Structures are given as structure tokens and as C-alpha cells.
Amino acid sequence: RDQPRSRGLGDVYKRQRLYRLPVEQVDVVIHRQSIVHSLVEYRDGAMIAQLGTPDMKLPIRYAFTWPHRAPSPDTPLDLLTCGDLTFRAPDLDAFPCLRIARQCAKAGGTACAIMNGANEAAVALFLQERVGFNDIPRLVESALSRVEVKYAPDLPDILEADRQARAAVLQTVGDMV
């Protein structure tokens, strides 16, 4: 999957919920070198970043060994040879799922469950070559317009929203044929 789409649908919502932040305080920054894995800005403006080689072995290893840090057999990041680190704001026209993710996180309720279910169904259809890559955000938005958002949901409400979103994507694709 493309990184900004993945970041929009997963990371914005996870950070917002995990740290109990308003969605306006969670930013996505495009960093093509994939060396800065996370960044926290403090109230005083200071920032702390976690840097590493551009692969997922380290975070996966840490997930399995937490709260300890296991020694890595891999070569560590060398700041003298890794090159420049660049950052830019995402283009919300180029990455519409990021805009959708922000709207859903702000809406609350089952909106994120609808978004996630619709995205998973749309990506599955893309991988089956039944829809184009650029159809994914349109299918997600269509599901969001067709499935009612419930506020203060319980687990059955969330699971039902996911099911309805997946069905809405399949119905929309069926209507396109």
C-alpha cells in the first residue's frame, strides 16, 4: 500500500486515540527517506525523534521484545552516510484517504470502523484487479455516505459498521459494472 494512505487510515486514528489528542494535534509528514519513524513535539517546541534504518525489522523486533530492547544483528543507522533528511506536508489532493481519515477521526463514533472496513474491501478489490488504485478513496467515501455513523457505539455496533461498509463497497462496485 502507499505510505500516506496507510498512515492516514491507521496512524492518525491510532495516535489520536492512544494519546487522547484532538485530531488537529496529530500531523502526518511525508519523509521519503523513511529514517525518522516517529516524532514528538513538546509544549516548549522541542522535538524528539526516533531514527532507524528504513525497514520494519527494528519496530517489529521491539514489539516482540517489549519492554526490553534486544540486540540487533543488523547494521545500525549511520548518520554520516544516510544523506539528507527531507520533510514536506502531504498533498491532500494526491492522498485523499488522509483527508478522509482526519474527517472520520474528528467525527468519532463508528466513522473510523466504516472507513477501515471500506478501505480493506476496496484494497482487496484492487489486489484482485477489479478496481483501479484511484477508485479506493471514492469507494471509501461512498461507503461513508451510505452507512450510518453511530455515536457511543458498543462492540457489536462497530462490527456491524465494518460489515455494512464492506457490503457497501461491494454494492458500489456491482453498480459500476
Give, region by region, the residue ranges found by the protein language model:
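Catalytic, metal-anchored helix/loop core of enzyme active sites in primary metabolism
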Residues: R1, G10-V177
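Cationic, low-complexity basic patches in intrinsically disordered or flexible, solvent-exposed regions
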Residues: P4
